[in-house]
Every structure is written in structure tokens, then in C-alpha cells.
Amino acid sequence: MSKLADLRQEYARAELSRDHVTDDPIEQFRAWFDEAEDAELEEPNAMTLATAATDGTPSARIVLLKGLDDRGFHFYTNYESRKGTDLSQNPHAALVFLWKPLERQVRIEGTVERLPAEESTEYFHRRPRGAQMGAWASPQSRVVDSRADLEENLDTVKAEYGDEDEIPRPSHWGGYVVRPTEVEFWQGRPNRLHDRLRYRRSDPAGDWTLERLAP
């Protein structure tokens, strides 16, 4: 820990200019994501999700991107978790993707909506069976006395659904879509003069403005 102030890395892998990007940030994200996959990065769909309660108290955690379309960025969780509670009170969020070997970040801000129930159900049934049971067994973000309590909950779920061909989706579990109003692409550059290109719009249905930000 004594060397924290001396930890640094020079970035010189690539550059980013207006000539390098598309007019649509969703398409630009897809292009960068494909490059992250081609580079065989571990879990390139891992992203920081930041939410805030109505009093402004923030919270952040790593979740996985599980879908992307013209509406925005999809993830799934327990609606009664800390993030679910935050989003029910304050439907705004920020996402950050870090692809360190490529010296890249993508930062997203936007409004958040629940995905339609049928989409959540379809994705739920594509999950491993154990993960489906876990969604029933875990009272996410609540205090539990011990790990044994969780295992007991799981045993109860197995007893109820173990012989069923299909486990129903819990009503407290499902998907969200972050509808972006701002998307920033960051490329590391020498001397900390990084490239930052930001797309922004005033509402999720508006036109995009592209601008360069100082690092």
C-alpha cells in the first residue's frame, strides 16, 4: 500500500478521433465490444452499475451485460435488491466498462426501465438450472444469519421444483434496460492526454450530438 502513489502506466496502444467512430453510439459500442471479444478478454460484458437512492446515496456493483438493442443495455437482477430498490425510487443509472488490455473505457448514463415480463421469463429459462433455483433461494441484499440459511433455502427450492421440467420465474426477479442519454468512449493516450468522445442527447428518443472532451 505504501507504493500506491507510484503505481501508474503509460497508455500508447491506439488513438480515437471522430474519423474512427460511427454516428450511433450503440453501433460504436458493438464495434468496441467485438474487439474486446476478439482479444479474448475475460468477461468483456462485466460492467459497473451505479445507482442512487432518492436522498442521493450512491451504490455501485459489478453486473453482466446480457443484451443490447436499439432500446439500450440490458441486465437482470432481483427487483428487491439494493439496486432494484434504488431504481424503483430513482430510475437513472450509470454503467462503466473497463477493457484494460485495450486501454479503453466506455461510460454510459441513462434512464432505466423494466424489461417486459415475457423477455425476463425467456431469459430466466435460458439460465443454468442452478442459477434459476438460486434466484428463488436468495433474499438478495437482505441480512441473513449464516451461509447455512441460504443452503437451507436452496434445499427447500430443490424439494419444491427439483422434479419439475420448468422452474417458474420469480415475480421479484427480472430485467432492466438502461436507455442511454450519454455514452462516452475513452482511449488511453500518452502523458494522460487521453481521447474522450462523448455522444449525448436530451432524451432517449432524441438525436445524438458527438463532442470531444478534455481528459
UniProtKB/Swiss-Prot annotation:
Cofactor section: FMN
InterPro entries: Pyridox_Oxase, Pyridox_Oxase_CS, Pyridox_Oxase_N, Pyridoxamine_oxidase_dimer_C, Split_barrel_FMN-bd
Keyword field: Flavoprotein, FMN, Oxidoreductase, Pyridoxine biosynthesis
Annotated binding of FMN, by residue: 61-66, 76-77, 82-83, 105, 140-141, 186, 196
Binding site for substrate: R8, Q9, E10, Y11, K66, Y123, R127, R192, L193, H194
GO molecular function: FMN binding; pyridoxamine phosphate oxidase activity
Lipid metabolism as UniProt keyword: no
Enzyme Commission (EC) number: 1.4.3.5
PROSITE patterns: PYRIDOX_OXIDASE
Highest taxon, organism lineage: Bacteria
Example of a GO biological process term: pyridoxine biosynthetic process
Pathway assigned in UniProt: Cofactor metabolism; pyridoxal 5'-phosphate salvage; pyridoxal 5'-phosphate from pyridoxamine 5'-phosphate: step 1/1; Cofactor metabolism; pyridoxal 5'-phosphate salvage; pyridoxal 5'-phosphate from pyridoxine 5'-phosphate: step 1/1
One Pfam match: PNP_phzG_C
UniProt xrefs under SUPFAM superfamilies: FMN-binding split barrel
TM segment ranges: none
EC category: oxidoreductase
Function: Catalyzes the oxidation of either pyridoxine 5'-phosphate (PNP) or pyridoxamine 5'-phosphate (PMP) into pyridoxal 5'-phosphate (PLP).
Quaternary assembly: Homodimer.
Protein name: Pyridoxine/pyridoxamine 5'-phosphate oxidase
